[in-house]
């Protein structure tokens, strides 16, 4: 079946989802969760085949870890669907309303996008998360995962489709595109009029390709060259703890800090304990000459280092002369994801927040908090680094648009 045919089926399914009740959608989510647990052995067999093929192809340990499933991970994925069912349904929510002078009742309400396309890399959990959040928000979804997870995704989507159909909603609410050819990606990116929005989740190269080549509207997510700036008025112990957590709590996420900027006034106090903490955690520091004075283990930082989203046990560190210099550095190298300042100065915090252009700005907190769950939004489809249509963690409301409903009693203009 071609991508166009799948997209047409998705549009038909989306029409049914648009009028489905919350009870209908929540029942489908619970059925999906139960089916994943019941058919775990089938899913793990497919995943085992993907892992074996990946090892033969020389995939890195990090990629294999993201690809791997076990019974515990499948149970966690199922639990995430149940938690999704407990979240409020965004569709039909009244965003604003008023009675006009002529007596017309005006309401702006949330409605589903319709058909959402998602292109992503070797994370089978994204297959289920994306299917769940799209269904909950009333959208049909077209999933295009990576070839390295092809067998796992086929098994997962088979389970999900059977479960959805068993509750009376269309099986075509969830569809998987062929991952063995790049043609499916090209067709999906050009299915304007059939696909309402495209969301890429993955590395910089994937996101750049989709943004540059798609004719379907795109919500750009993900790439995070995040900074922690330690201000002249920072508490040293707090600064070291935040920098260490932001870098090492999890290395391979888009909200992980990749750069540490330290005001020259506190460099001698902050850098020795910070460098020692990074060394103890196995993190390689790429630093400017002022940083290298404090440790022979520091590697020289290049312009490329400052621009790199490492997603590994590496961090670039630079000493800056002022808050102005820190902001200028972030403007040059940042990706608009998450930036943090550590300071006891309210005026410095206000200035940093006002001047830094990012989806999230942290004051005396780790960059790792930029997350739908941590923000209390529940499920998220990704973290948008653009300004239209959504910015920051994208929860259920961000997978909707709005329509105006005007109710009258025979008014004429």
Curated annotation (Swiss-Prot):
InterPro entries: Ald_DH/histidinol_DH, Ald_DH_C, Ald_DH_N, Aldehyde_DH_dom, G-glutamylP_reductase_CS, Glu-5-SA_DH, GPR_dom. One of its GO terms (cellular component) is cytoplasm. It comes from Salinispora tropica (strain ATCC BAA-916 / DSM 44818 / JCM 13857 / NBRC 105044 / CNB-440). It catalyses: L-glutamate 5-semialdehyde + phosphate + NADP(+) = L-glutamyl 5-phosphate + NADPH + H(+). Its EC number is 1.2.1.41. It is found in: Cytoplasm. Pathway: Amino-acid biosynthesis; L-proline biosynthesis; L-glutamate 5-semialdehyde from L-glutamate: step 2/2. This is Gamma-glutamyl phosphate reductase. One of its GO terms (biological process) is L-proline biosynthetic process. Belongs to the gamma-glutamyl phosphate reductase family. Its main location: cytoplasm. Catalyzes the NADPH-dependent reduction of L-glutamate 5-phosphate into L-glutamate 5-semialdehyde and phosphate. The product spontaneously undergoes cyclization to form 1-pyrroline-5-carboxylate. It is an enzyme of class 1 (oxidoreductase). Keywords: Amino-acid biosynthesis, Cytoplasm, NADP, Oxidoreductase, Proline biosynthesis. GO terms for molecular function: glutamate-5-semialdehyde dehydrogenase activity; NADP binding. Pfam families: Aldedh.
